[in-house]
């Protein structure tokens, strides 16, 4: 039997949302076990997953996302390698996440733009038209002074897929 849990969305404090009474929401019945890493095109894996740990990438551990520490459990279970992309002047990159039928899959993406650079990342989550499962993507980003990061996400998943987008 697979254990399920509820994940809380929006740990970030925001007075407007607090006033409206919707500061937190629950995503129900998320499996605790059975998570895989989302397959990504080979060129991206070769280019961006073996980046050495430096102070900049280490600092991403302190960046909070909307799902907070709860998504960390899924990250550990999936054993997903972090995809780390940084800009040098102006850079554009495409990520295609291919989610498979019947799978729960996770991807961990970190984006960094040094001072006065521009980084654009197009991210497409896709599946077969009749597939089902859960696709979860956590994206953390950091932009230095004068830098810009543009994140364009396309959800091309089947209507039977549940998509968790943790930015």
Can you say where each PLM-predicted feature lies in the sequence?
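Long, low-complexity, mixed-charge
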Residues: 1-82, 90
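Conserved beta-strand/loop scaffold segments within soluble protein domains that form the structured core
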Residues: 64-167
């Amino acid at each position: 039997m697979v254990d399920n849990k509820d994940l809380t969305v929006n740990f970030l404090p925001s007075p407007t949302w607090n006033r409206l009474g919707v500061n937190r929401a629950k995503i129900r019945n998320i499996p605790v076990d059975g998570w895989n890493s989302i397959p990504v095109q080979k060129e991206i894996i070769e280019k961006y997953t073996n980046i050495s740990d430096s102070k900049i990438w280490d600092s991403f551990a302190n960046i909070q996302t909307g799902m907070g520490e709860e998504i960390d459990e899924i990250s550990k279970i999936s054993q997903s390698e972090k995809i780390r992309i940084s800009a040098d002047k102006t850079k554009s990159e495409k990520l295609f996440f291919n989610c498979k039928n019947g799978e729960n899959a996770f991807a961990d993406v970190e984006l960094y733009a040094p001072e006065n650079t521009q980084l654009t990342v197009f991210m497409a989550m896709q599946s077969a038209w009749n597939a089902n499962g859960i696709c979860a993507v956590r994206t953390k980003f950091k932009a230095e002074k004068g830098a810009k990061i543009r994140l364009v996400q396309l959800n091309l998943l089947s209507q039977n897929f549940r998509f968790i987008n943790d930015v």
